[in-house]
Each structure stands twice: as structure tokens, then as C-alpha cells.
Amino acid sequence: MMSESNKQQAVNKLTEIVANFTAMISTRMPDDVVDKLKQLKDAETSSMGKIIYHTMFDNMQKAIDLNRPACQDTGEIMFFVKVGSRFPLLGELQSILKQAVEEATVKAPLRHNAVEIFDEVNTGKNTGSGVPWVTWDIIPDNDDAEIEVYMAGGGCTLPGRSKVLMPSEGYEGVVKFVFENISTLAVNACPPVLVGVGIATSVETAAVLSRKAILRPIGSRHPNPKAAELELRLEEGLNRLGIGPQGLTGNSSVMGVHIESAARHPSTIGVAVSTGCWAHRRGTLLVHADLTFENLSHTRSAL
């Protein structure tokens, strides 16, 4: 067991690690996003689309060179944490994440995006009631912490929708729901977008799953072959809409479609859609019990 002084040192160290990582992902896209954008850029045939993709890559390089956020909307910070039951700072992790956000806000700097409901006052720290939002998965007999950081920008959050379908609507109803939302709303979400689809029982379970879906590496597939096929068919169909980069038409509309699912009630099909914009800022940090860490999402960047 750690002494109080040693524990405080460990808390300070992990806070600094997470703060630096959060600040870093505001300026650098994860490897898979950069690779996918390059693929779409090379495949684009419209002159306007080519110009926009060129501007996107110029923007990404300037963000790195100037060490400034790649988009002025650095989002509301969310954490999706898979932590072992034996991780030594499990009890302190919630407060560590909050303090890390406040420190990253100054380091990056990050735009102030936490407005208290009803008071309508911006806290100026990117923290507040329930913010940063943290989703927990506790892993038995494990002493690591995998921390996924996501910057939920306003534009890419606006298309988010969730609905409960009658079972008679079937998977055709799921497809219709996805197409209705992306075709009408994604144009203003800084496309090409990454589409997350959650399928479960209720609006809240489907919504959480849809958000988790856009945290997966682009191009990864659902373990169920039928779901994986639906991911590919949705991606192909949405790209035929020709929304194009920044909604000005082009060869593609999406960077990918990911589905996350959970067993449902026989009487309902809960479905939700979440989107990530082209500047999809998320990162995965694996922290070991001794506080050594691995940057799993940005292997071309150093903390």
C-alpha cells in the first residue's frame, strides 16, 4: 500500500500525463483518421473536393507546427475508461480526470465549452456539473487503466438522434433511421463524418453504444458477421449520397460506419446515431500500475 505522500505524487504524475495527452489530441488527429482522410483525398475527383481535402491537411500540419488546436471547437471532454479493479489509483481517478481537463484547458489551450444548465454560465474551465463526462467499465483482476479521451464538438454532436422502434420495423427501420439522420443533418457536421450506430433496447443504451462506436479504430468491424455486413452496406449507401467534404458534394460522405449492439427486449429495437467530424479528435492512453503508459492512438506523436 502507498503512503499518503507517495500516493499524492502518483496522483500528480497521472494528472500531468492525462492533461498532456488531452492537450495533444486537440492538435493531432489519431493515426487512423489521418490515414482515412488521405485515402478519401486521393480518391476524390471533384475539383472543389480536392481543394477542401488539401485545406484540411494544410490545417492539420499548421496545428502541429503551431501547437494549436486543429479546430477552434475543442468540444466537451468525455472519458471512456476501462480500468482494472486492482489499478492503484482507481479511487482517485475521477478527480484526476477532472483536474487533468482543467490543466489541459490552459496548456492547449482549449476553448471553454462547459456551460452550467439553467444558470447559463460558462465555467471557463471545461469542467462543471457532470463534466467531464466519464463512462466506466471495471475489469476484474486487472491493474491497468485504458483511458479513451473524446472531444465532442458542437457541430458533430448536433446530428445525434435516438429512437425506439417497433420490432416489426426490423433492421430496415434501423437503416431508414440512419439514412434519414445522415442525409438531412450530416451536411452541417463538417463531413466526411464517422457514423456510430447503437442498437439495443432503449434510447439511453443505444445512445451510449453509438458514442462508443465512433471511438473504435476506423475500418474495424463488428464481431458478428451480419452486423459487419450491415456496417459495410451502410457505408456504401451513405457514400452514394455524395455529401462530400464540408457538405459541398464529392465522392464520399463518411469515413466509416461502426455498429455497437447489445441484446434487446423482444418488444423494442432501440437505435441511435452519433457522428464524428473530419477532425475526429479522440485518443487512447493505456496506463499501467507503475504509471508507465502507452499512446495507442497516436503512434506518430510523442507526449
UniProtKB/Swiss-Prot annotation:
Residues binding iron-sulfur cluster, per UniProt: 71, 190, 277
Highest taxon of source: Bacteria
Cofactor(s) in the UniProt record: iron-sulfur cluster
A single MF term (Gene Ontology): L(+)-tartrate dehydratase activity
GO terms for cellular component: catalytic complex; cytosol
Entries under InterPro entries matching the protein: Class-I_Fumarase/Tartrate_DH, Fe-S_hydro-lyase_TtdA-typ_cat
Record-level GO BP terms: single-species biofilm formation; tartrate catabolic process; tartrate metabolic process; tricarboxylic acid cycle
Keywords, in A-Z order: 4Fe-4S, Iron, Iron-sulfur, Lyase, Metal-binding
Annotated EC: 4.2.1.32
Catalytic activity: (2R,3R)-tartrate = oxaloacetate + H2O
The protein's enzyme class: lyase
Induction: Induced by tartrate, via TtdR.
Subunit structure: Tetramer of two alpha and two beta subunits.
Family affiliation: Belongs to the class-I fumarase family.
Protein name: L(+)-tartrate dehydratase subunit alpha
Lineage: Bacteria, Pseudomonadati, Pseudomonadota, Gammaproteobacteria, Enterobacterales
